[in-house]
Amino acid sequence: MQELEKAVPSSVRVTRQSENLVILEKDLATEQMVLAMGPQHPSTHGVLKLECLTDGEVVTEAEPVLGYLHRCFEKTAENVDYPAVVPFTDRLDYLAAMNSEFAYALTVEKLLDIEIPRRVEFIRILVAELNRIASHLVAIGTYGIDLGAFTPFLFCFRDREIILGLLEWASGARMLYNYVWVGGLAYDVPADFLKRIREFCAYFRPKAKELADLLTSNEIFVKRTHGIGIMPADVAINYGWSGPMLRGSGVEWDLRRNDPYSLYSELDFNVCVPDGKHSVIGDCLSRHLVRAYEMEESLNIIEQCIDKMPSSDGFNSRAAIPKKIRPKAGEVYGRAENPRGELGFYIQSDGKSTKPLRCKARSSCFVNLSAMKDLSKGQLIPDLVAIIGSIDIVLGEVDR
């Protein structure tokens, strides 16, 4: 054995385990391997591909590969009239289409400098918050499936069906609504709609707490998310994060509160940020908790909208604007707090055409996903699933 050790080059470390077993460090070294995850992998929530560089089970680098769902949204928007862009915004974040319509309508109305009826504003906020709850239910339910918990998915989608039924009653569609138009709404809500919404709030309020506890009281779920994919607040800000992702890192930033649009300044609600008691601030569990507790705040906003909403007597669902819109020459940026963060639209008008000269969409999903390299570095391969699920991406908005 001693003769064998003498024959080993000095550059190779020798570890003596016993008289008969000598382990050379060179034999234990591993080579880095490229692992392709997706674009058909079920945990990527769409056609996302991750090219991962791994050292054994540890991820050293993960690079998102995008473009599989690119649909030329911006170029399409520049070739149709301003109001005709609304149905295309539905197909960005198709799980929160009402919020996408809202953001676009706000931007064009800012360019037109027009005033919207108060009843329209409250209805817009109401349906947007309903859609926010439905979106968070998808995020929570599918996150449970990603990590092996099937029961929460069933409960989440049971309650989401109720919301989709209410939105279908108001707009005529379950997911792609085309309801929030430039200047107002497609039409007023049905006669008993607000009564049904209030009944839903009373029903869902205890359910929201139950759904939040269903996963956070699950020991396996907590171990899979606690301390995984930590993003410090300063790094999150530098990346341009927003929404539950930024709030999950402990930053109390919500456009509805910090830069109010529509009538949010008249509404009272809390901005949900983790307190660090149940999670490491900035980890996957923190981001999940933000979404879970935001649903109750959305219920508070909805009930306030119903209380403050003016009567429908003599109500016109649209402001007095011409059928063909020709905004004055200029540019404008409008933004709104979508379920996944800030969705913004930059629109440029030449003052002559009925079509935007330039229409740029700022996607929160794209920005949040861009931090995948930092989030995944040093994590285990199975933890990539937990990290992707915590980002809650919609590839329709990422690729546009």
Swiss-Prot record:
GO cellular component terms, A-Z: plasma membrane
Enzyme class: translocase
Any coiled-coil regions, as ranges: none
SUPFAM superfamilies according to UniProt: HydB/Nqo4-like
Compartmental location: Cell inner membrane
GO MF annotation list: NAD binding; NADH:ubiquinone reductase (non-electrogenic) activity; quinone binding
E.C. designation(s): 7.1.1.-
Record's bilayer topology term: Peripheral membrane protein
InterPro entries: NADH_Q_OxRdtase_suD, NDH1_su_D/H, NiFe-Hase_large
Primary subcellular site in the record, as a coarse category: membrane
Sorted UniProt keywords: Cell inner membrane, Cell membrane, Membrane, NAD, Quinone, Translocase, Transport
Domain of life according to the entry: Bacteria
Catalytic activity: a quinone + NADH + 5 H(+)(in) = a quinol + NAD(+) + 4 H(+)(out)
Family to which the UniProt record says this protein belongs: Belongs to the complex I 49 kDa subunit family.
Subunit structure as annotated in this protein's UniProt entry: NDH-1 is composed of 14 different subunits. Subunits NuoB, C, D, E, F, and G constitute the peripheral sector of the complex.
Function recorded in the entry: NDH-1 shuttles electrons from NADH, via FMN and iron-sulfur (Fe-S) centers, to quinones in the respiratory chain. The immediate electron acceptor for the enzyme in this species is believed to be a menaquinone. Couples the redox reaction to proton translocation (for every two electrons transferred, four hydrogen ions are translocated across the cytoplasmic membrane), and thus conserves the redox energy in a proton gradient.
Protein name: NADH-quinone oxidoreductase subunit D
Organism of this sequence: Chlorobium chlorochromatii (strain CaD3)
